[in-house]
Design a protein with these regions (language model features):
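Basic, low-complexity intrinsically disordered segments
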Residues: 1-211
């Protein structure tokens, strides 16, 4: 797996991409996507940014069209890679978050829902790109959100959500403090110990290579 250094989202976006070391089943690729969403949310939080939209692009492996049952397994669009090999057309979609956020919970849930909506579970995944669109400073978003809440929100529900987001922000601050002091692998999610996870390996790399 390697970082996609040539990937350049639009100026108001923050994103990352991975090329997996081998073809991943959709369930394992979803795990990697959740790790990426978690890292993206922390990156946004550290930069003082929020986003209101996620964009996902998933590239399939050529092995998805190999084998005797390939024709019965896939009937969608096909494209050709740079080596002239036939591959399923990449999956692509976006998910609106409702309000600007850098919440790990909200971003991970939205990314997972987006993956489930656009990715064909019968195909093998090789590349994953996740982007946070329409990013802007947290303070700027808070001013706009406050005006909207005054007019449209249920007060009790809004207060409960704000309390939960405040707890999340304190947790994100604590995670970043620990990682800055002891390294990114000093504190990781339980999902990153599952088979197929890549975050711990990526945390030990600099510029796409092992540190």
């Amino acid at each position: 797996m390697a970082d996609i250094k040539s990937y350049r989202p639009e100026s108001s976006s923050v994103g990352s991409g991975q090329v997996l070391q081998c073809a991943y089943r959709a369930d394992k690729a979803r795990l990697v996507l959740r790790e990426m969403a978690d890292a993206l949310a922390l990156d946004l939080f550290e930069r003082g940014l929020v986003t209101d939209q996620l964009v996902l692009t998933v590239g399939y492996d050529v092995e998805s069209l190999s084998g005797p049952d390939a024709q019965s397994r896939y009937h969608g669009a096909v494209t050709t890679d740079r080596y002239g090999r036939r591959t399923p057309k990449p999956a692509h979609g976006s998910e609106n978050l409702g309000a600007p956020t850098a919440s790990v919970r909200q971003i991970t849930q939205a990314a997972s829902a987006l993956f489930d909506r656009v990715v064909d579970p019968a195909l093998l995944v090789r590349r994953i790109y996740l982007t946070a669109n329409h990013t802007l400073p947290r303070e700027q978003a808070a001013q706009t959100e406050y005006r909207q809440l005054d007019f449209f929100s249920d007060e009790a529900q809004t207060q409960a959500e704000q309390l939960q987001l405040a707890r999340e922000r304190r947790m994100q601050e604590a995670i970043l403090t620990i990682r800055h002091k002891y390294g990114k692998n000093a504190i990781v999610r339980a999902m990153s110990f599952q088979d197929g996870a890549t975050a711990r390996q990526r945390n030990g790399q600099i510029g796409g290579h092992r540190a």
